[in-house]
A protein has these predicted regions:
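Iron-associated oxidoreductase/ferritin-like identity signal
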Residues: 1-196
Length: 196
């Protein structure tokens, strides 16, 4: 607590805060790249708006961490993180999987920062971080849900393709089976907004 009385943060916490701010910007850039990739995808227009929103949220988080560092008169020294060299994010499932990996890495950094704050008795930092940790948990759960949803869509699409391929010219009477017409179609792609 002596460090807080002087208005300073421990070096360990300063370094961890800089790392988290830098990684938030990195995630924001990756999400912006994903948003740009899906901007003209007529089959998955919601991916564009989702990733654009997340890019804005992550950039705002980075600003909040930097503001916290400035509040305690700490040096801002953001480590450089190489931007992903991905121009083709692929299917929605692949993009969500990439997003989930980014969020899990960010969660690890936040947990490390929390551990540093606890070791150094930085109670103000622990209070400040709570909302980010809670939101991170929600984001990861949301992306896991979306990943499972995308897998279900793929499975459903594969099932619908199989009867067409396997049936061929079936039935001597020339009548089509009703089961294909009555099977439920997969729900439309929908990505609801995560809590921010």
């Amino acid at each position: 607590m002596a460090t807080q009385a002087k208005g300073l943060l421990s070096e360990e916490c300063r370094d961890a805060l800089n790392q988290v701010a830098s990684y938030e910007l990195h995630v924001s850039d990756a999400y912006l790249s994903m948003a740009c990739y899906y901007i003209e995808d007529s089959e998955a227009p919601i991916f564009h708006s989702f990733f654009q929103d997340q890019a804005d949220v992550k950039r705002e988080h980075a600003k909040q961490f930097i503001k916290y560092l400035r509040k305690y008169k700490c040096k801002i020294c953001l480590p450089v993180i190489k931007r992903p060299d991905i121009d083709n994010w692929g299917t929605g499932k692949q993009a969500i999987l990439s997003a989930l990996q980014l969020e899990n890495s960010l969660n690890t950094l936040l947990q490390d920062l929390k551990a540093s704050a606890s070791r150094n008795r930085e109670t103000n930092l622990l209070r400040f971080m709570k909302k980010f940790l809670d939101e991170q948990t929600r984001n990861i759960s949301y992306l896991e849900y979306q990943l499972n949803y995308q897998k279900e869509l793929e499975t459903s699409a594969q099932r619908e393709e199989q009867p067409e391929n396997a049936a061929g010219p079936s039935g001597a009477s020339g009548q089509e089976t009703e089961s294909a017409g009555n099977s439920p179609s997969p729900p439309a792609q929908k990505i609801p907004k995560p809590a921010t």
